[in-house]
Structures are given as C-alpha cells and as structure tokens.
C-alpha cells in the first residue's frame, strides 16, 4: 500500500483574502536514515516563521492507495485512519467532528467520515474501489511540533512530504502587516537564548588547600574536646563507685 503525507499551508493576507504562496518541498528521504529525524528536520523550518502574521495552521494530508476492499483490509484501514485523525485538531480529535476523505478514481467521490462521541467512525464507501483516498487534518503548528505521538505517526508513512512556504513571500506580507493596523498572530514562540555565565577567574590549587585545612581543623578540635570531657566525667564516677563498694564491704 502506497501512502504519503503532504501538507498545505492556508494563509490570509492583511485584507483577509486567502493567499497560496509558492511552496517548496521537504521530502522525507533527505538522506537521513531515520524518517522521524527527517520529519523533525522539516518542522524546524516552521520555527523560523514566528514573525509571520497569521501563520498558525498546517494541513497535513494522508494519501492512501485503496485496493478492492476486503473485510480484513477495511479493519486495518479503519485503525490506521483513526490513528492519524485522532491526532488532528487542537483537541486531538477530528476537526469539527468530521474529516472529508476524497476518493479519486474514474469518478471523484467524497467519503465522509463522521466521529460520534463514543468514538465510532462511520464510512460512506460509495465509489471507493481502486481509488486513492486523501484524509486532510488540521494541526496547530506549535502543538504539532510538541506532539511526539503525531510526529511518530507521520514518520511511519513510507513516502511523505511536508511543504513549507517561501520565506521571501512571507516577509513581504509581514512588512505589509507591520505598516497596517493588523495584529500578527504568532503561534510559535522561540525561547530566548540562555544568558551567558560570567567568566570567573580560576582559583589556584594552593588556595583551595588552605581553605580545606581551615575548615577541617576546628572539626577535629571539637571531636577531641568532646572525648576529653567524656574522659573527665567518667573518672570521678568510677572513684565514687569504688568508695561506696569499700564502705559496704567494711
């Protein structure tokens, strides 16, 4: 079964019109052995868009080639579709309770997958044979980057692609937004770099020796003084006991 994951960037400009900027592709292969590393490599690109207005959501599309379905295969597909779609959206469920799955064959068909409160998923399998099914789910980029379960699910796909927009096109939109009354919506906050630690002069080894000796000597003296006090207190007690015994014997 051939499968792939792609993404579509939905962006609106300052006037509210929907914009489709030129896209460049970040393939899952990338010469990296681990596909999960490749997925994180692609999402690193998104972190650089924190100054871009309205850059909030990414739409990941899972494409599955569907052979003539048998009951066994439908159960596998059902489970796999659930694993992908339950990671979608801000609450981790299907976006708005529904996911549109479009099957492309000789005739274009829409298969509606609706999720009930008990987790049951219903399919409309009309015109589903020998088609390619595409499931589109909406992710919040910041939450997707922090969601390791979603990243693992994306990395399981054999041939997936993550698209990200041309930075130059977005910078122009960002400059236009700064000159208007539009408030940029920032979904990814990059943490500030850690403050540099002040350089401390190295302390010579001889000074360390002196300091340790200073703190060790009083401790030894305290222990010795305690021993001496115990010895002094034991001697008169023994002498008194001896005197009492002698008097009793006499």
From Swiss-Prot:
Family, as annotated: Belongs to the ascovirus HvAV ORF18 family.
Organism field: Spodoptera frugiperda ascovirus 1a
Main location: membrane
Keywords: Membrane, Transmembrane, Transmembrane helix
Membrane association type: Single-pass membrane protein
Domain of life: Viruses
Compositionally biased intervals (Pro residues): 190-201
Ranges that cross the membrane: 230-250
Annotated compartments: Membrane
Region (Disordered): 182-205
NAD keyword on record: no
One GO cellular component term: membrane
Name listed for the protein in its UniProt record: Uncharacterized protein ORF12
């Amino acid at each position: 079964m051939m499968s792939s994951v792609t993404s579509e960037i939905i962006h609106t400009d300052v006037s509210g019109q929907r914009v489709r900027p030129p896209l460049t592709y970040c393939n899952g292969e990338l010469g990296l052995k681990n596909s999960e590393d490749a997925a994180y490599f692609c999402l690193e690109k998104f972190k650089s868009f924190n100054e871009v207005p309205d850059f909030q959501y990414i739409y990941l599309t899972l494409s599955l080639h569907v052979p003539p379905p048998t009951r066994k295969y439908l159960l596998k597909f059902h489970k796999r579709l659930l694993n992908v779609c339950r990671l979608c959206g801000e609450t981790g469920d299907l976006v708005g309770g529904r996911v549109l799955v479009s099957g492309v064959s000789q005739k274009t068909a829409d298969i509606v997958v609706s999720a009930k409160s008990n987790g049951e998923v219903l399919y409309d399998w009309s015109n589903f044979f020998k088609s390619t099914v595409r499931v589109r789910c909406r992710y919040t980029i910041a939450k997707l980057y922090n969601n390791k379960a979603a990243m693992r699910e994306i990395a399981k796909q054999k041939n997936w692609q993550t698209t990200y927009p041309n930075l130059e096109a977005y910078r122009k939109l960002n400059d236009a937004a700064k000159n208007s009354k539009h408030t940029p919506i920032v979904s990814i906050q990059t943490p500030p770099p850690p403050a540099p630690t002040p350089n401390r002069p190295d302390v010579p080894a001889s000074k360390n020796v002196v300091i340790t000796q200073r703190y060790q000597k009083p401790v030894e003296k305290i222990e010795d003084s305690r021993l001496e006090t115990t010895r002094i207190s034991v001697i008169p007690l023994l002498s008194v006991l001896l005197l009492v015994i002698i008097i009793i014997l006499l």
